[in-house]
């Protein structure tokens, strides 16, 4: 919550005006907006891709580790050196996948809530059918390992996801928002994709519709994190 600043009608209209045949929505940790998103896409002739940017526990959803330091995109570091949670992009390929996303979202709230609704490897294995997964953004398990210089750990995490979702349904995700960490890790992600024979997927981390909305979105993030616009 307090992350996306787009209004659905404006977002879908922008996609339609750009000639985009499809548009995906992956809200953080929930599927509250799925129905309205689906209806709006259908009304404007854009194919809806339903998904969720899930929060994944480091290992088990029952974990309740102590946090140390500042809150960041992954909730912050734990005393054990891990993260409170990681980001994982999940997309419904078909009706089976849609129903499995509902299961994952619901169980993350009911069984894994700790700062955020978290799922884990066990739930992913049980409800993987009909779902396409990606390695995710800088907050993902794979990239967090790369940012720590742990290329073997990143490869292992990516391999584990590929094993769960299947070779055809797991993608290595690449993003370029001008962020140095992305420039540094994208070649490493390409290498992981080659080693796993996994397909690549280029994405854009969209949180607002128009360029001029960036200041309002910045203020929204400050409300979420308890910081100020003056902070870097």
Residue ranges and their predicted role:
Residues 1-232:
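Phosphodiester-processing cores and adjacent nucleic acid-binding clamps
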């Amino acid at each position: 919550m307090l992350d996306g600043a787009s209004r659905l009608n404006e977002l879908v209209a922008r996609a339609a005006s750009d000639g985009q045949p499809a548009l995906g929505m992956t809200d953080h940790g929930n599927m509250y907006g799925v129905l309205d998103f689906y209806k709006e896409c259908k009304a404007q002739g854009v194919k809806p891709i339903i998904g969720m940017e899930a929060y994944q526990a480091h290992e088990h959803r029952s974990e309740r580790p102590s946090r140390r330091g500042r809150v960041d995109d992954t909730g912050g570091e734990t005393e054990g050196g891990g993260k409170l949670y990681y980001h994982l992009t999940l997309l419904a390929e078909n009706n089976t996948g849609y129903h499995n996303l509902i299961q994952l979202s619901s169980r993350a709230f009911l069984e894994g809530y700790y700062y955020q609704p978290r799922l884990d490897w066990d739930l992913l294995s049980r409800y993987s059918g009909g779902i396409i997964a990606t390695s995710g953004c800088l907050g993902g398990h794979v990239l967090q390992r790369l940012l720590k210089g742990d290329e073997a750990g990143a490869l292992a995490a990516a391999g584990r996801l590929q094993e769960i979702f299947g070779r055809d349904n797991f993608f290595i995700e690449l993003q370029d928002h001008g962020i140095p960490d992305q420039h540094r890790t994208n070649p490493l992600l390409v290498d992981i994709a080659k080693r796993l024979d996994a397909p690549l997927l280029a994405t854009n981390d969209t949180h607002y519709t128009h360029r001029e909305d960036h200041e309002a979105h910045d203020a929204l993030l400050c409300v979420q994190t308890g910081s100020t616009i003056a902070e870097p």
